[in-house]
Amino acid sequence: MSSDDKSKSNDPKTEPKNCDPKCEQKCESKCQPSCLKKLLQRCSEKCPREKCPAPPKCPPCPSPSPSSCPPKPCAKPCPPKCPSSCPPPCPPPE
């Protein structure tokens, strides 16, 4: 019997009068931040933030191993960083 009495005090569902039913419905359907704040102030246990659908936690994508993804061979030789038409920024001293 004592455990039942304990659950009553711990379970806020037994005291719906602390929460505004209209606000609770809005919180459940639209999850308005203003409504949530009021609910959290009135009874944080009755309408917890968990009512808002949390974004699914996606597992981290495994980085592809270099062996499974070989680099593509260049069809054409890579051009030099500075084409021959471009003079060197600083001529070598003679």
UniProtKB/Swiss-Prot annotation:
Task: Return the InterPro entries for the record.
Answer: Lelp1
The Pro residues compositionally biased stretches are 53-94
Identify the Pfam families for this entry.
LELP1
- Renumbered to this chain, region (Disordered) spans 1-26, 47-94
- Family under the similarity heading: Belongs to the cornifin (SPRR) family.
**Name under which the protein is recorded:** Late cornified envelope-like proline-rich protein 1
Species in which this protein is naturally found: Macaca fascicularis (Crab-eating macaque)
Q: What is the lineage of its organism?
A: Eukaryota, Metazoa, Chordata, Craniata, Vertebrata
Gene that specifies this protein: LELP1
